[in-house]
Structures are given as C-alpha cells and as structure tokens.
C-alpha cells in the first residue's frame, strides 16, 4: 500500500495517539501544515479507502485508528528507498551518508554497535 507524504502526516498523528476524531486530527495536523478542514478530511477519506485506518462510530462522530503498524510502514518505506536508489543494498546508503561528514560520532558509534551485534 502506498501512503503519500501528506497521508503519512495523518498516520503519524494516529500512531502517536489513537483513536482520534476528525476534529482532533484537524487540530493536530491542520494548523502546522496550513491545511484546511476539507484537506484533512480528504486525507482521512483516502486512508479509509486504502484500509490504512478504520473508523468506528461514536455517537454522531467517528473515531479513527490506524490499521497499519508504524513499524511495518517504516520497514516498507525503507525497503522501497533502498530498492529505488541503492539496488536494495544497505552499504551504499551508509556510504552515501558517510560522504561529506553527514554522520555524527553518535551515528558512527550506533553503526559500529549494530555491526558488532550482527556479527555475533
């Protein structure tokens, strides 16, 4: 399932705190992104059609919850990035970020620890 960048903003709000009403979603994501109520409701509608979120009636309103786990979404997006730009290989991605001093000492330490863990 492909979730657009704008839709992912709504998903992030739901992953942080769900269930949420459309009003709560609008309040959380509308202002910071300069989106109207209509824009946010269109995004919610698209996510419902994609079955990325569910709606449960709660009186005269609906409560929205994510059906896609954030971890699964991140895994899929990460793999898509690797496939599109680095032929599915992680090493060229890390090399790309290491060029130009984009990795902090903390990043390097975390990568070393990960490699050590994988090597066991």
Pin down the residues of each PLM region.
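Short helix-capping/hinge SLiMs at alpha-helix to coil transitions
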Residues: 14-18, 31-32
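Amphipathic alpha-helical dimerization/coiled-coil segments
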Residues: 76-119
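Short, hydrophobic-biased segments on the C-terminal half of alpha helices
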Residues: 41-45
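Short beta-strand "wing" residues that participate in macromolecule-binding interfaces
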Residues: 55
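Glycine-centered, phosphate/nucleic-acid-interacting loop/turn motifs that mediate DNA/RNA or nucleotide
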Residues: 51
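Pre-recognition alpha-helix immediately N-terminal to the DNA-recognition helix
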Residues: 8-13, 24, 92
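Short, cationic-aromatic polyanion-contact patches
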Residues: 3-6, 58-76
